[in-house]
Design a protein with these regions (language model features):
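Conserved N-terminal helical subregion
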Residues: 3, 73-129
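Glycine-rich FAD pyrophosphate-binding loop
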Residues: 24-49
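N-terminal Rossmann-like FAD-binding beta1-loop-alpha1 element of flavoenzymes
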Residues: 5-32
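N-terminal FAD cofactor-binding segment of flavoenzymes
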Residues: 45-85
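Residue-level detector of anion-binding/catalytic polar loops
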Residues: 29, 67, 126
Length: 129
């Protein structure tokens, strides 16, 4: 029997899995293909980076069902300073009182785990490696 899907996604990283979950929310089935398994992609130490998640990206994560998984893990970005080490000067960004934060910081591993947990619970998403 052949499992027919609407969409093939090459790469099960942050972008690919976000797309798969967003597509599932819209009723689109997908098959994610990656050279590694979800377990390999979430093992501790495989990706020590962190990502700054903008408010717009956070809203997307909330809409695809990641809020409860990610909310307790990140830390708010309350100010941003932009500098160029080779030149004088800087630009500072701070939200006005009541505007909330400028975004949130998350370990990439935490985002991946949340994405894979949500995808495992979603029958519209298939995976192969």
């Amino acid at each position: 029997m052949t499992d027919k899907r609407d969409l093939v996604i090459l790469g099960g990283g942050l972008v690919g899995m976000t797309l798969a979950l967003a597509a599932a929310r819209a009723g689109i089935t997908s098959h994610v293909v990656d050279k590694a398994t979800p377990e390999e992609l979430t093992v501790e130490g495989v990706d020590g980076r962190a990502s700054a998640i903008s408010t717009a990206s956070w809203n997307l994560f909330c809409n695809i069902g990641l809020k409860d998984r990610l909310d307790p893990l990140g830390c708010p970005i309350s100010a941003i300073a932009v500098t160029d080490g080779m030149k004088p000067g800087r630009i500072d960004f701070e939200p006005k009182p009541g505007d909330g934060t400028l975004g949130r910081m998350y370990a990439n591993r935490d985002i991946r785990i949340a994405l894979f947990e949500a995808a495992r619970a979603e029958p519209a998403i298939a995976w192969s490696s």
